[in-house]
Amino acid sequence: MLFGPESTGKTTLAKQLSVHFKTVWNPEFLRYYVDAREASKPDATKSEQITIAESELLNIAIGQLASEMAIQESNSDILFFDTCLHTNAIYAEHYYNNVPEGIERMLSSVNYDFFFLCNTDIEWEYDPQRESAAVRELLYDKMLTYLIDNNLPYSIVSGTGEERFNQVLSVLNSKFPSIVNK
């Protein structure tokens, strides 16, 4: 599981790892959801900064879970996920001080083998779906605390793209040698 706030290299890393291991990766559902929603709006109503209404949170989480379940049907030994339901919960708590009960229920049905928490030591890139570098830092701290509080297995990856890739490979080789070294 590639985990972390916005603009920390999760998507790039997921793509690189899926190519390296000749497997599939699951993109972040929220990005597709927002792109589709914004594409359906007339140009005059599109905004510079995209926001998500609290009423949309559950549908986004359902879409995230459905996409994760679909990719698991590939029967690959190793899969890479660019974000997950835990991220949905953290963002819901951050922006609305509330995690919808439906998301809490869905969280109890998922299990990820390992989390790679992507550090914020790479340059933040603007995107209408991203708020700011300052919020990225705040969310990174919340995500680290979440992993610790929930006793989830994780490793922090940092540095350049190549350094991050090599760190993930090293952890995978040590934690999952029977899968990685096939």
Predicted regions, residues:
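Conserved nucleotide-sensing/catalytic segment adjacent to the nucleotide-binding pocket
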Residues: 44-90, 94-95
